[in-house]
Amino acid sequence: MTCPSYGLRDMFNEWRAGLNSLRERPLLGVTDAPPCKRPGEPYTFPMFRNGGFLRLFPRFLALSFLFCLTLQAPAAHAWGNEGHSMINRLAAKTLPADVPGFLRSEAALKEVEYLGPEPDRWRSPSEPELVAAQAPEHFIDLEPADALGPLPHKRLDFEAKVFAAGERPEKVGLQPWAATEVWERLKAAMRQYRAMAANHEDTRPVEDAILFYAGWLGHYVADGSQPLHTTIQYNGWVGPNPNGYTTGHQIHWQFEGPFVGANIHAPEIEAKMTPAKAIDGDMFDSYVAYLRQTATHVETVYQLEKAGGFSGAGTAESRKFTTERLAAGASMLRDMIYSAWLDSAIPVNDPYAGK
């Protein structure tokens, strides 16, 4: 019996199979191929035969090192878990007193806080269809989006414009539509809450739905307060660069992740929040205006990075700027939740009436 040659791919598959035995559950792509051995010969892994391990050991070390790097590589989560959680909790905490009491309870604050990073938990390669569908909902590159003309209110109308221009919607981003659609879900749930409360029904199930929608909405609103989620300059300057801004691909996570977790705190954010108010007019238009205001700060992020503002403790200017951005997100989220509650009182026609 002739044993096939053994290479790095075989070594990697055996390493995966070893992990499989530890986990005691199957790994996709690992098969139970018969071991390569002669009759009566004790089984040894091929990598240990004929000096194979010594020859492959340098490659084994390199592979192990690369694998460790993949485990440690951070994902691009706007504001990281800490920032998203703080924004959500502060928004719920500062809601006006005329919202239902359950929205301001400590249990609600904990639930909404937990849900702040939730859409970033939907970005695992284990759910590839979900990742592909929802990744564009975290950002919009306003430069190419605006080149197509006024932004339509409906997602599918915008996608049609993008396709007609020979582009792909997932490359441009779908942030304002995602946020507005979740806000409308929240408003619909609040309308149902009003109806159930008026009929003296148990409102706990719809309260759970309201908290979920509020927390889910919070993620996108927080993304919308991060300037690098509104531009083609999202992770290193592209195009003409007369000011010498970084072209590296570290600025996005450096700004919104470790720096926020280490230096920005909830009391400072709350102190910079605006007074609560209802949002007048069309919500989509108001949200796009919010994104455009955020986009005016793109170059400030690069200026602060150039001055070392996101390294270690940063600078007083970078801490102040980041705190203000998080406060803008928390204020907008609070006002959107409050507006959903007020708008949910407006009577609507039953879409199923007469059917």
Predicted regions and their residues:
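Short, positively charged and aromatic/hydrophobic N-terminal segments
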Residues: 27, 43-44
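N-terminal, motif-rich segments that launch catalysis or mediate targeting to/interaction with membranes
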Residues: 72-216, 230-327, 332-355
